[in-house]
Regions:
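N-terminal Rossmann-like NAD(P)+-binding subdomain of aldehyde/semialdehyde dehydrogenases
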Residues: 1-123
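Short, low-complexity, polar/charged sequence segments that are solvent-exposed and flexible
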Residues: 22-25, 145-146, 175
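Residues within well-ordered alpha helices
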Residues: 38, 50, 146, 173-174
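Conserved small-residue-rich beta-alpha loop and adjacent elements
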Residues: 107-173
């Protein structure tokens, strides 16, 4: 692992080299902007076009949504060992994150006024889970579990499908 030391004489140049690796090229930025503009203009038809181009998936507008039944079926079709592993991971993530949730509190200040904080869940949460060739099941577990324990009433998950137009069953089960 490469380290940077503030005490080093070449710290500024080393930092510049390090930061340049995170820069997004103008070409990539322009390409993404054009795709987003097209999707805003043409909606689901544009999404289907890019799914074919990037993922090789032939999708039709109106067929993007995966229903609760398909998610439950995907979980049931998994081998028992994988279901158990997902369940254990979910329990660990939930246990950890429940401990990290902030708690409401109130107190009286020196003037006798009641002060405090109240934490309410975000009403609507969207989570993106990288999918396609290599679905990131861990991302689905981490983000969906946290949104649930935070009691977000509406959680929408977005993920690309494979070339067959299907979402990986492991990923669906993790949601």
């Amino acid at each position: 692992m490469r380290t940077l030391s503030f005490a080093s004489k070449q710290f500024d140049s080393d930092l510049a080299v390090f930061r340049s690796g995170a820069a997004i090229s103008r070409e990539v930025s322009d390409s993404v902007a054009a795709i987003l503009c097209d999707i805003r203009a043409r909606g689901d038809a544009a999404v289907a076009h890019y799914a074919l181009g990037f993922d090789g998936a032939r999708l039709r507008p109106g067929e993007f949504r995966v229903g609760a039944r398909e998610i439950a079926d995907a979980a049931r079709r998994l081998p028992a060992a994988r279901r158990a592993a997902l369940s254990a991971a979910h329990a660990s993530i939930e246990d950890f994150n429940r401990k990290a949730l902030p708690a409401d509190w109130t107190a009286r200040n020196r003037h006798g006024a009641v002060v405090g904080e109240k934490f309410d869940p975000i009403r609507r949460v969207g989570i993106y889970v990288p999918g396609g060739e290599v679905p990131l099941v861990s991302t689905a577990l981490m983000t969906a579990t946290l949104a649930r324990i935070a009691q977000c009433p509406e959680i929408a998950a977005f993920t690309p499908c494979g070339a067959d137009g299907r979402v990986a069953p492991d990923l669906l089960a993790a949601l």
